């Protein structure tokens, strides 16, 4: 798709919409998700915003340089934000737009990423994970299927043939497999793709900068 110019990520859920947290609440999972002492200063960014940001970095290979965030709490009976809209600048000059929300009624775990470049764009949707849409600036739209012929890289992370869903747990299996291979490998030049503590540090820095930006209502570097 050429030089990357714009990245758009949205990840929406609805579990916190209209929720009321009290001592009699039987849904204990909601308690820790909205407990600042446990989850941190942001409900939406700590839970799903990290996934959105890491996904954009992984797919594009780019790192953010500055951002402007607008954090919002839509539910009256909770103490943490559940909606975040973030404008991003990347190191190569590309722009980004993020929307993550856990109070979007009807939001069915809708994780979607679109990356636009000088020669076209790609789009991937979590609810239809086996397919990647390639939109060339010139020519017809192409739908690339998981494990398609010639996709050596994706085949390394696939355990079933094309047309069959991998399943959620296989994502963890890919991480374990790469870590084990890295430990046992004698090839020091081989590049591995599993996330490390460094990626965790980057996302933690991203979250804190979003919180500071929203509070100060200004662009911040990170």
What residue spans do the PLM features occupy?
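Short arginine-rich
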Residues: 206-216
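Short, hydrophobic secondary-structure boundary micro-motifs
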Residues: 4, 67, 191-196, 220-222
